[in-house]
């Protein structure tokens, strides 16, 4: 938008901030013409009209339709092998702890959409890894054996194969939960969609156990934990074999070893910033392996539209 009246600068900025932080959050472009930029206006201009208070208002949260919510919860209650895939919408709604609690309380394995904001620390018990069969191969087992995939705060884009098989099997029920209608429109491929603030949905889901409506045991969760451990152990063993062979042949350090060494030198107060093709690829793998061994980092920044 372009500000065409200097007396309405306050109004335009207030509206831009509201648009940027509500619904489907994101950047808003606001132009200020040079003639207005170099003009002067009274400090109180615009305050004679509502809203009289220019303080930031609480962010509006989408509350789920009871009937639609009940349909999703019924699917979850009847599921034997559910999976949660979290995206940047969880981060925008400050619902990371709600996500972790749902996974822990209900024994549901949690995955992160690749190139989206990291939601949970790699050391979190319910977090398995990326929903990516290349950077985290055990996710293939989880997705291909699942009967319900709950995609919360994410888009069914190329990272998730647009929700299509073979990434998410045809036999699996695919549900998308988003905090804005704009995001839901991008997820038309879902079998079922729910307009809801991610935190509200995750809390309601988590409360199923407290209300004695959740019967899923720990077998499915433990299967995924076992697959993760097997992958970590095999990856480290293969790396050890390759390192020994490299020493004999005068080869160079493996990029996975380099990534692990970098993180080994870091503390829980350090941020890891990764970028660039193979560096990013191997670092993502190393992050999961190191996290499985108890490594904690303050945070991770990486390339991607939703990071």
Question: Where do the protein language model's features map onto the residues?
Answer:
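Conformationally flexible catalytic loops at phosphate/diphosphate-handling active centers
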Residues: 15, 19-78
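Anionic-ligand anchoring segments at beta-strand to alpha-helix junctions in alpha/beta enzyme folds, i.e.
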Residues: 64, 76-149, 265-307
